[in-house]
């Protein structure tokens, strides 16, 4: 069963996100540092009539990397062609995509860290000098064919920038670190979504919903849909702070944006290991989750909110975690 607070896309959310997707920077809420940098780089590239430098967008899932790629294309006034690392299985697949590009086009590769190395190596000359060399035929009849490519921009998105090879990372001239959203920006996103879908929501309810959305627009929009359902059945359709609190409590999302899995992690650390330190592998076994799942999906938010600290000897529950979970905290803990 999928978590309501899962950062990854669930069900029909890809369609929903396309519906909500802003088209230009003026419509894009939050990520001001990345936007301000990109505005300058895009304007300069347009003045020189050049393709934008290759751009890497990295950060946790659900923060708008794909949306930012489409905004970049719209601001540049060029076409965007979209694919993903896992979808490009062979070097020939990438060659076909590159050969189909027009001058100035943007090639967006989501989950770029999951490309096979043989595919990645094709990108090196394509990104640096706009050409590729491919082998035609097999055995003694094989020959190398040189293909020139039009100037293009590769926009890569990844949740795990550390997994990119150094040669690939070095070829990105622009790096955009997408961070968790601040509460005012997330509240504005909730209000914008409710307006698009013609929901009635009070400012207090929008704030409460944003507060429990883990700094992630994707989660905020998902929770808003579920709260809307609750308001229609249990109320008069209006989402106020009382209805929002009741619905989110029913969904096991507490006031800090933690769900039952987050709480299970903290409870396990406190009850079984005295608050830690405890190794990630040991913790994962105890809560019956994959190590990578804990590391990528749960831990970043718990660390950001100050519930967990990473140390050389393992993970440690903080005083804030003890207080939030209703345990007494002493220095001995």
Swiss-Prot record:
Residues that coordinate or bind ATP: 20-21, 62, 65-67, 128-130, 171, 181, 218
Q: Which GO terms describe its cellular component?
A: cytoplasm; Holliday junction resolvase complex
Q: Which GO terms describe its biological process?
A: DNA recombination; DNA repair
Organism superkingdom: Bacteria
Name the segments for region: Presensor-1 beta-hairpin. Answer: 130-148
Q: What class of enzyme is it?
A: hydrolase
Which molecular-function annotation in GO is an example for this chain? four-way junction helicase activity
EC number(s): the record gives: 3.6.4.-
Annotated positions binding Mg(2+): 66
- Please give the catalytic activity noted in the UniProt record: ATP + H2O = ADP + phosphate + H(+)
Head domain (RuvB-H): annotated span? 255-333
Where in this protein does the record put region Small ATPAse domain (RuvB-S)?
A: 182-252
Q: In which compartments does the protein localize?
A: Cytoplasm
* One of the Pfam families matching this protein, by short name: AAA_lid_4
Query: How does its record describe regulation of its activity?
Result: Binding of domain III of RuvA to a single subunit of the RuvB hexamer activates the ATPase 2 subunits away and nucleotide exchange in the adjacent subunit.
Record's comment describing the protein's domains = Has 3 domains, the large (RuvB-L) and small ATPase (RuvB-S) domains and the C-terminal head (RuvB-H) domain. The head domain binds DNA, while the ATPase domains bind ATP, ADP or are empty depending on the state of the subunit in the translocation cycle. During a single DNA translocation step the structure of each domain remains the same, but their relative positions change. The presensor-1 beta hairpin in RuvB-L binds domain III of RuvA.
Functional note: The RuvA-RuvB-RuvC complex processes Holliday junction (HJ) DNA during genetic recombination and DNA repair, while the RuvA-RuvB complex plays an important role in the rescue of blocked DNA replication forks via replication fork reversal (RFR). Catalyzes branch migration on Holliday junction (HJ) DNA in complex with RuvA from S.typhimurim and ATP. RuvA specifically binds to HJ cruciform DNA, conferring on it an open structure. The RuvB hexamer acts as an ATP-dependent pump, pulling dsDNA into and through the RuvAB complex.
Similarity section? Belongs to the RuvB family.
Subunit architecture:
Homohexamer. Forms an RuvA(8)-RuvB(12)-Holliday junction (HJ) complex. HJ DNA is sandwiched between 2 RuvA tetramers; dsDNA enters through RuvA and exits via RuvB. Only 4 subunits contact one DNA strand at any time. Two adjacent subunits are contacted by domain III of RuvA. An RuvB hexamer assembles on each DNA strand where it exits the tetramer. Each RuvB hexamer is contacted by two RuvA subunits (via domain III) on 2 adjacent RuvB subunits; this complex drives branch migration. In the full resolvosome a probable DNA-RuvA(4)-RuvB(12)-RuvC(2) complex forms which resolves the HJ.
Write down what this protein is called. Holliday junction branch migration complex subunit RuvB
Q: Which organism is it from?
A: Streptococcus thermophilus (strain ATCC BAA-250 / LMG 18311)
Ranked from the top, the taxonomy reads: Bacteria, Bacillati, Bacillota, Bacilli, Lactobacillales
